[in-house]
């Protein structure tokens, strides 16, 4: 399958970025607890993955509605489309593991090691977020999640806008 190239002007990209930031803020800005932030961001990122698949695949809607795909499988389908970068995909897989640890073990405590597993694939921003958080795990988590979800939203909203499916 040939990888599709998307062409967008600087103004279109600026508008897409603005839409992504507004959308993320509407879902995640009021979440205070680190655990709730992780869970809410996971739900939102899953929605973004579904929208991405529906927009990119001719029968994507049927796949999402009838396929009973797990989060991990949705990441794999998104990766198979061939547009998203591998670092983002790796980070999403590790993010899902962290969410599963929290969701399936009520006594589980989120750790910096878990955060690093999904922040390191994001590149240099991982170290920047560690420094900016000044030792506060909750703040480092917030910065990392916002960046992770923003990157995913960027891909999703870009293809939705360029295909005319963004609402």
PLM region descriptions:
Residues 1-79, 83-167:
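Amphipathic alpha-helical interface elements
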């Amino acid at each position: 399958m040939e990888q599709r190239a998307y062409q967008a002007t600087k103004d279109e990209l600026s508008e897409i970025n603005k839409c992504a930031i507004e959308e993320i803020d509407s879902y995640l800005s009021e979440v205070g607890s680190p655990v709730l932030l992780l869970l809410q961001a996971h739900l939102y990122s899953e929605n973004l993955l579904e929208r991405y698949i529906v927009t990119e695949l001719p029968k994507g809607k049927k796949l999402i509605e009838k396929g009973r795909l797990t989060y991990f499988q949705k990441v794999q389908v998104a990766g198979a489309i061939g547009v998203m970068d591998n670092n983002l995909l790796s980070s999403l897989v590790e993010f899902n593991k962290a969410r599963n640890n929290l969701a399936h073990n009520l006594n589980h405590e989120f750790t910096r090691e878990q955060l690093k597993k999904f922040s390191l694939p994001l590149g240099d921003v991982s170290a920047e977020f560690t420094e900016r958080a000044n030792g506060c795990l909750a703040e480092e988590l917030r910065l990392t999640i916002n960046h992770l979800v923003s990157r995913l939203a960027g891909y999703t909203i870009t293809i939705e806008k360029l295909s005319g499916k963004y609402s």
